[in-house]
């Protein structure tokens, strides 16, 4: 999903027979509203395969509440320290346990969570520990792969998440997804290939032990560099819809507008077929033995 709002403006201009995207701000905003309207109509309230995302955070001793990503819509799976955490209804949490709950009440049951409001995560029981920072000896970068060396065993695993802090350049810092673990003192993550190597500073790595997969919200396009929320191969759906909205107000062009909306519907039909293939057919099937 790399097609930008700027790309859409240019491609729509070409379809309209124009040499370039408009410079008039009113017309630019008008066409942007068409693209956003098209994206909302195309995606609707469905859980499309490409709207699945994964984020992480770090538990804090004695802290129950954590903020989820701003695009959070609905939870798919939550893991704490690698273990699956079971959802519980908010009213059940209040009705079943002392609130806030005590750890000993959960010794024989699965830890739970519930969501309050739009993106407020509550963990039950309240975490009683937090990951410790691990000192980093060095970070080097080759071809976009950052290799981290720690002074002691880090305890991390492939596809885990960490927070890097204290590094210069700052591109190494922040939430990082571990792409490989060579041994107990080395792991890698992706970084821009132009990032200066090696990193300097007093560097630490801290495990992000709360990992959640979720369905994300569709965000309207605003800046020219914003990318569309659907796969690039279906971008023509947005262009066709915007074209129909643009020419639909021109006398004598109603038929052309209808053709554009029909094109939009056909592309969305293709996207729906791909959704069905991924959800139904692209799954492992247990063989039948005679």
Question: Language model features by range: what are they?
Answer:
Residues 1-130, 205-290:
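Glycine-enriched, solvent-exposed interface loops adjoining structured elements
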